[in-house]
Amino acid sequence: MAITQESKQIQVLRFIHEAQSENGYPPTVREIGEAVGLSSSSTIHGHIERLVKKGYLLKDASKPRARAIEVTDIGLEMLGISTTPGKIPVLGMVTAGTPILAVEEEATEFFPIPDNLMQFDGDLFMLNVHGDSMVNIGILDGDKVIVRKQENADNGDVVVAMNDNNEATVKRFFREADHYRLQPENNSMAPIILQKVSILGKVIGLYRDAIY
């Protein structure tokens, strides 16, 4: 019985961590119950209190909802999640201009993951930007973009996309009636129209070595 009880507590802990990573705030008691198969709110509260006592959760009702319950480093270790800061591999160059063959398979260097992106550890890569087609949104020649790996994109997302010739570019993505439009953020540049496109990832961050 003790093993079953511990297992259910870990399920609660894991769901709290996953929901908070995905949404930016912890789940409700009802959501926890639905996820782990518990209908009694008092039972769920009991699991949470025991997780707090074990040091796996930190609960502070005085904080905003986003930080009212947090999984501690000890709790993350219990879930098998490393608390050592991860690194983002830099995989070459991407153009903010005419597409070029750019993305390499092996990292040329590594950057520490910012705290606000730690939940995406393992799903991130960086590319050096060459060109000025995205200047309207502040992506400049020489910047590094942080990209979350994903194969799909919503209209308006800034993505790293690859055409049939394995040429990569960073542009704003639009799926239209019979083609895909990769839109520059530079008023002097025309969009790229493609019949087929592969999405390598969505741009979610930016790093700049120096401010001029």
Swiss-Prot record:
The keyword Oxidoreductase does not apply. The active site is at 133 (for autocatalytic cleavage activity), 171 (for autocatalytic cleavage activity). It catalyses: Hydrolysis of Ala-|-Gly bond in repressor LexA. Keywords: Autocatalytic cleavage, DNA damage, DNA repair, DNA replication, DNA-binding, Hydrolase, Repressor, SOS response, Transcription, Transcription regulation. Residues 29-49 bind DNA. One of its GO terms (biological process) is DNA repair. SUPFAM superfamilies: LexA/Signal peptidase, Winged helix' DNA-binding domain. The record marks 96-97 as: Cleavage. The keyword Iron-sulfur does not apply. Transmembrane segments: none annotated. GO terms for molecular function: DNA binding; serine-type endopeptidase activity. Its EC number is 3.4.21.88. HAMAP family: LexA. Belongs to the peptidase S24 family. Represses a number of genes involved in the response to DNA damage (SOS response), including recA and lexA. In the presence of single-stranded DNA, RecA interacts with LexA causing an autocatalytic cleavage which disrupts the DNA-binding part of LexA, leading to derepression of the SOS regulon and eventually DNA repair. Homodimer. This is LexA repressor. It comes from Leuconostoc mesenteroides subsp. mesenteroides (strain ATCC 8293 / DSM 20343 / BCRC 11652 / CCM 1803 / JCM 6124 / NCDO 523 / NBRC 100496 / NCIMB 8023 / NCTC 12954 / NRRL B-1118 / 37Y). The gene is lexA.
